[in-house]
From Swiss-Prot:
Sequence positions that bind substrate: Y155, S289, N337
Reaction(s) catalysed by this chain's protein: 5,6-dihydrouracil + H2O = 3-(carbamoylamino)propanoate + H(+)
Gene name for this UniProt entry: dht
Name of this chain's protein: D-hydantoinase/dihydropyrimidinase
Source organism phylogeny: Bacteria, Pseudomonadati, Pseudomonadota, Gammaproteobacteria, Pseudomonadales
Upregulating conditions: By lactose.
InterPro entries, sorted: Amidohydro-rel (IPR006680), Hydantoinase/dihydroPyrase (IPR011778), Metal-dep_hydrolase_composite (IPR011059), Metal_Hydrolase (IPR032466), Metallo-dep_Hydrolases_sf (IPR050378)
């Protein structure tokens, strides 16, 4: 099975140049001018378009059991929507219940993911601590290719990891060469503020951002960063939404600490006024955590991307329909937290970032694909256009337009946080494993994707929109071999 993309401009995180790209058996076989197609080769005309690495979304929650319900998007529908938006790989989250075996939860999620339309991998959440958890973390790294563990510093009385769990788990991550990640919100403060607001009679969505002010994110980010600094492990902070949290990351990185930050397009574009919409269902549709914030935080986040102190863009794609959101009609703290975004992430970032001059094309590639691949040790197998890399590509039409709407999107949810926004710059074709799965509005994927596992240890040479930062990866990485891969893993980047 072969595919030749002709006449496009190849755009990577470092350079752009005109070239043909030949894909054979799921890999990039050749790059150059005027390539000759092999027999029975599909030819795709890329004239006037950019050929970029397929998007990698490092933060999704498909069919997540959460807050008394289950997210409406399953692994097939969610990854199919991702293909429609140019995303060819996701990293989802295994979230065990407290006291549940990590391995048991991992196999449950892995079973759900078998129907994925594109490639996938997993972070595993640490929701409790014991010697069993420590042992199973080791098995997940050694036998199942897991190389990152998530810690929720929020959601008290549910999945929140207290400081003793953070310390123990970060230490274990260091031993294994895995990357600890955190949802940085002070869960005790959030719980206190929720109860206080409810006692004052504030029950609607407008209370949601008041219960999770930027200070609770800044405090938690600071605490996680200091714990990681003391233990000596890298740290990845998910969905940064506030100036305070960004300041903590910036300060740590200025001292040479390997801390990486993730941002969502919604936090770059939307503000907290959405929670004051007079229509309850509309306001509730925006409820996620951390919440959307006052406009000054958005400008700070753009500066974080431009300075290289924020490194990836994700979606935290976790869909709940209006009927599910209505579970919190009389108590905002019971509104299921989550919004969609996997289909819109890349187009929104291109339109708001590249078209506005805030980001270059190369920075766009880094933020949507390459940096995630580097941090989670999938580079150069993914996030790159080079011979031997996976043929996961997106052919991007810089003049194409799309109006974002729940009426037309492929996400399995009845709400779109970008409703009515028209973007310029969209994927015309999405290619996964060398096959065209999205073509000018036609979703061709009906089969299965495959598991994508990294090697343990944070990669190096991660580039944000600013200068490259070089950080040593844990030595344990070289002793670990991922299993369950579609193809042999490539070594971590050493640029």
């Amino acid at each position: 099975m072969s595919l030749l993309i002709r006449g496009a401009t190849v755009v990577t995180h470092e350079e752009s140049y005109p070239a043909d790209v030949l894909c054979v058996d799921g890999l990039i076989r050749a790059i150059g001018p005027n390539l000759e197609p092999p027999t029975d080769c599909e030819i795709l005309d890329g004239s006037g378009q950019y050929l970029m690495p397929g998007g990698i979304d490092p933060h999704t929650h498909m069919q997540l059991p959460f807050m008394g319900t289950v997210a409406s998007e399953d692994f097939f529908s969610g990854t199919a929507a991702g293909l429609a938006g140019g995303t060819t790989s996701i990293i989802d989250f295994v979230i065990p219940n407290p006291q549940q075996s990590l391995l048991e939860a991992f196999h449950t999620w892995r079973g759900w993911a078998q129907k994925s339309a594109s490639d996938y991998g997993f972070h595993v959440a640490i929701t409790w601590w014991s010697e069993q958890v420590a042992e199973e973390m080791g098995e997940l790294v050694a036998k199942h290719g897991v190389n990152s563990f998530k810690h929720f510093m929020a959601y008290k009385n549910a999945i929140m990891a207290a400081d003793d769990t953070l310390v123990a788990s970060f230490e274990r991550c260091l031993q294994l060469g895995a990357v600890p990640t955190v949802h940085a919100e002070n869960g005790e403060l959030v719980y206190h503020l929720q109860k206080k607001l409810l006692a004052q009679g504030m029950t609607g969505p407008e209370a949601h951002p008041l219960s999770r002010p930027s200070q609770v994110e800044g405090e938690a980010a600071s605490r996680a960063i200091r714990i990681a600094e003391t233990i000596g492990t890298p740290l990845y902070v998910v969905h940064i939404s506030s100036r305070e949290a960004l300041d903590e990351i910036t300060y740590a990185r200025a001292k040479g600490q390997p801390v990486y930050g993730e941002v969502l397009p919604g936090h770059l574009l939307l503000d907290d006024s959405v929670y004051r919409d007079p229509d309850w269902a509309t306001a509730a549709g925006y409820v996620m955590s951390p919440p959307f914030r006052p406009r000054e935080h958005q400008e700070a986040l753009w500066r974080g991307l431009q300075s290289g102190n924020l490194h990836t863009t994700a979606t935290d794609h976790c869909c709940f329909c209006a009927e599910q959101k209505a579970m919190g009609r009389d108590d905002f703290s019971r509104i299921p937290n989550g919004t969609a975004g996997i289909e819109d992430r890349m187009a929104v970032l291109w339109d708001a970032g590249v078209n506005s001059g805030r980001l270059s094309m190369h920075e766009f590639v880094a933020l949507t694909s390459t940096n995630t691949a580097k941090i989670f040790n999938l580079f150069p197998r993914k996030g790159a256009i080079r011979v031997g890399a996976d043929a996961d590509l997106v052919l991007w039409d810089p003049q194409g337009t799309r109006t974002l709407s729940a009426q037309t999107h492929h996400q399995r949810v009845d709400f779109n946080i970008f409703e009515g926004r028209t973007v310029r710059g969209v994927p015309s074709h999405t290619i996964s494993q060398g096959k065209v799965l999205w073509a000018d509005g036609d979703l061709r994927r009906r089969g299965r994707g495959g598991a994508v596992c990294g090697t343990a240890g944070v990669s190096v040479g991660v580039r944000g929109a600013g200068a490259t930062r070089r950080t040593a990866a844990p030595d344990a990485r070289s002793a670990l071999r991922p299993l369950g891969l579609l193809r042999s893993p490539s070594p971590a980047s050493q640029i």
